[in-house]
Each structure stands twice: as C-alpha cells, then as structure tokens.
A protein has these predicted regions:
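Hydrophobic alpha-helical transmembrane segments of multipass integral membrane proteins
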Residues: 35, 70, 74-86, 90, ...
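Interhelical loop and adjacent transmembrane-helix boundary motif
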Residues: 19, 56, 60-63, 224-270
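Transmembrane alpha-helices and adjacent helix-loop boundaries
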Residues: 114-121
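C-terminal transmembrane helix and the adjacent membrane-cytosol boundary/short C-terminal tail
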Residues: 2-3, 7, 24-28, 169-184, ...
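Membrane-interfacial helix termini and adjacent extracytoplasmic/periplasmic loops
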Residues: 9-15, 53-61, 66, 101, ...
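Transmembrane-helix boundary motif in ABC transporter permease subunits
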Residues: 11, 16-17, 56, 78-109, ...
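Periplasmic/extracellular loop-to-transmembrane helix junction in inner-membrane transport proteins
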Residues: 8-21, 44-81, 93-97, 244-252
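Transmembrane alpha-helices
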Residues: 27-32, 81, 111, 158-176, ...
Length: 285
C-alpha cells in the first residue's frame, strides 16, 4: 500500500504476460487435441484390445469383414486416382488462368465440404434412382448405378474432390510460373514442363491431398449408406460394417474394425507428414 493509502496491484512484466498467454494457448490446444482426438482413439483401442486377441483375429478373418475391407480399398483407390487427376487440373485452372466465373468455380470447389454427405447421397438417388434423370439411359444399356459399386464411387469422389485442389492451389500460387516459363523457353513441351517442373513443385501438396482423400474415403459413411443399400457381402464397406455391428449389438467386432480403419488413416497421415518435414529439412540444408 502506498503512502497515500491507495492499494497498488502488482503488474507483471510484459514478457511474463506474453509467456503466460502463450502457455495458456498451448494448454488449450493440448486439451483440445487430447479430449477430442486422442481420448476417443484410446477409448476405441482399449475396447478393441479388451475383447481379446482371439476376437480380434477372428473378426479380421470373417468373410464379411474381408469383403468390406476389399470394397473400401477399391473405392478408395478409384477415388484417389480420379480426384488426383481432376484435382490437379482444376487447381491449375484456378491458380493459373483468369476468366469469367473463376471466383464461382473456386467457391463451388468447397461445396462438397459444406453439403451434408446424406444430401450428396440423395442427389445421387435423384440422378440415378428409379425415375431419375439418367436412370432410363443406364437401364436401357444394362448398367446398374444405384445400390452398386458405381454410385458408391461417385458419391465418394464428389465428397473428396476438394482435398487435392485445396492442397495444390496454394502451392501453385506460391511457386509462381517462373520455372515453367524457363522450361518452355528452353524448348520443353507442355507435357515435359508439367511432369518435370510443375508436378515436382506440387508433389508434397498433392501427396498430402491424397492422404486426406484416402482418410476421408476410408471413413465415408453418410452418402455411401444412402446409395449402397448396405447389402452384407456385396455393398457393405468397412464403415457400414461398423454401423451394422453396433446396430446388432456386436460391439467387439465393431470396435476391432473401427480401430483398424483409424490406424490406417493415422499411419498414412503421419508418414506423409514425416516425409514432408524431412524433405523440407533437406532443402534448407
């Protein structure tokens, strides 16, 4: 207390205040990751392991589970290939070209992220279902889209297409066109320029987009549930198997398959991030 009788509150130095604020932000981030990411994963892992190794092995050997993993793999592979090709093309158009409607195209790219997957599935039903816009043509040619693999692939591609685009566009904007113009000046064709210059510059963005696409494709359930019919042993993906397992109170097999899917996605993302950081360190040295 001062001589005048006023109570003075001690003021922390600015550096100390910054450290406290910084530490608080770190604590909040760790709490967020721990509660919303790590804790659920630990819970699933604990539930799966608690079922016993015999249950884990027997679950992973079930024909329905094996077919579900196979179908998930097929959908994921096709989705990755298609979204990578068209994603890079769209990213090049958005990053390099100037035309009327470019802003609208850039906004529409994010539409699959804003629309519920269930709505995406219903859109597919409107287009390819009984009485749908395109159903008569496909039916007349003996092609089945709805409640079959094609519709499952289509909705998954629609949902996953933004990931490659949004990872590649910033990279293209950052690197610019100087190297590409230099390659053309030296006589390189458009294809040579793309494969030797452009693709080399965007490879890490593309790989990370592919990793996100893979993880999203593996975990997709809403749209696939609508268009697949969830026929066991035919149109049931791994995530749909998990849903059916819990609906039928078969919790242990559901936890085992769920943990397997989670581990695949986590390992893939960690590997991509590790290689990316190693490459960045090599470039700096």
């Amino acid at each position: 207390m001062s001589k005048s009788g006023e109570l003075r509150v001690p003021v922390l130095p600015s550096r100390t205040r910054r450290r406290l604020v910084h530490g608080g932000f770190i604590a909040i981030a760790l709490l967020y990751v721990g509660v919303l990411v790590i804790a659920p994963l630990i819970g699933i892992a604990w539930a799966a392991i608690s079922a016993g190794w015999s249950t884990i092995v027997s679950t992973l050997r079930q024909p329905d589970v094996l077919h579900a993993f196979y179908l998930t793999g097929v959908i994921t592979i096709v989705t990755v290939i298609v979204t990578s090709i068209f994603g890079v093309i769209v990213a090049l158009v958005i990053a390099r070209d100037r035309f009327a409607g470019r802003a609208l195209m850039s906004a529409l790219v994010d539409l699959p992220l804003a629309v519920s997957p269930v709505i995406v599935g219903l859109m597919a039903v409107v287009l390819f279902g009984l009485g749908g816009w395109f159903e008569p043509w496909f039916t007349s040619h003996g092609i089945r889209i709805l409640f079959a693999l094609p519709s499952m692939v289509l909705v998954t591609i629609f949902i996953c297409i933004p990931f490659v685009i949004r990872e590649v566009v910033p990279v293209l904007q950052e690197v610019g066109i100087t190297e590409e113009e230099a390659a053309r000046t030296l006589g390189a064709s458009s294809l040579q320029t793309f494969f030797r210059v452009t693709l080399k510059n965007i490879r890490w963005g593309l790989l990370y987009g592919i990793a996100l696409t893979t993880a999203r494709s593996i975990g997709e359930i809403g749209a696939v549930l609508i268009v697949s019919g969830q026929i066991t042993g035919q149109t049931e993906t791994a995530t749909l198997y998990v849903l059916r397992a819990f609906d039928q109170f078969q919790d242990d097999p559901g936890f085992v398959v769920a943990l397997t899917l989670a581990l695949v996605s986590i390992v893939l993302l960690v590997l991509i991030e590790t290689f990316k950081r190693r490459h960045e360190r090599m470039q700096r040295t």
